[in-house]
Amino acid sequence: MTKITYSQAINKALTEEMNRNKKLVCFGLGVNDSLNFFGTTKGLEKKFGSERVFETPTSENAMTGIGVGMSLSNNPCVMMHQRLDFFLLAMDQLVNSAAKWHYMFGGKKSVPITIRLVVGKGWGQGPTHSQSLQSWFAHIPGLKVVMPTFPSDAYNLLKKSIRDPNPVIFIEHRWLHNIEQEIKKIKYTNKKNSTELISKGKDFTAVSYSLSTIEMLSIKNVLQQNKISFDLIDLKSIKPLNISVIKNSLKKTKKLLVLDSISHPFCSVGSEVLSQLYREKNIKLIKPPILKTLPDVPTPTSTFYTKDFYIKKNDILNDISKLVGKKIKFKYSDTLLHDVPDSNFKGPF
């Protein structure tokens, strides 16, 4: 069976949407360099020309202003940043213009811009090159925030984002760009609720998104060997956030683990999930829920500190053991460098 990577799925979605809408423009730093923005923009300039697919100067605020202006002029845009951190220079354009335009003009004007931001960890990039601020963007009225996990999600959510009349923050964890999926699963669906139950079990409910979902799947075999099964729910959309699938699962398991391994604890996506569930009347847990996040400190650079900063499989399994009240037998080495991806990763950094 032919497979497609996450990067290829994004490329496929961009190609199809640029064919569908002749006004759609893609631009950003690295769009036309030899690495083609992690392979996601490969061949686009050749197909659609340099007026629709182009590099920009290193001026994030100017890039965003141009994108907002073009979008207001009925030219939808996909703007790309190889680091979320760099986009912080453009917050005024995003928060005070793009996010508010539809509201301020009574729904008569919109800003159809999709902003692709890459997050992740790796190779000691430290405090200013590895931030994941999805909760920050989700706090802003007028913005949607999505974080797809699998190629089919990236394909679907990017197409939906591009077709949305208002701004969408599309966040990709770069460790996901080489994940593969059967190409037959790459189909466009217009479902409103992106939250999905991707694995079924009975002992507890796990909620995750983006790389956190892959981390939960990586310990599934160990749990099965210990006769523990779980419902795994992948959020995909951070805002809007739909908790109906989680509620249905908790009626069965009554135990909850929220793995938010790319957020800090305060006002995290995980804490928002718990907050919304707490306000529901009919949810009764038999044990306090567990929320796993990064510590409330900036990302360290030294591997001496990263080994205690990033969440490890052992950490997750120990918490699951407490949650289900059962000792779990497992063997994972903690001697690896915790901010270096495995051999499947093929990205530039």
Which positions does each model-derived feature cover?
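Thiamine diphosphate
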Residues: 1-167, 171, 334-349, ...
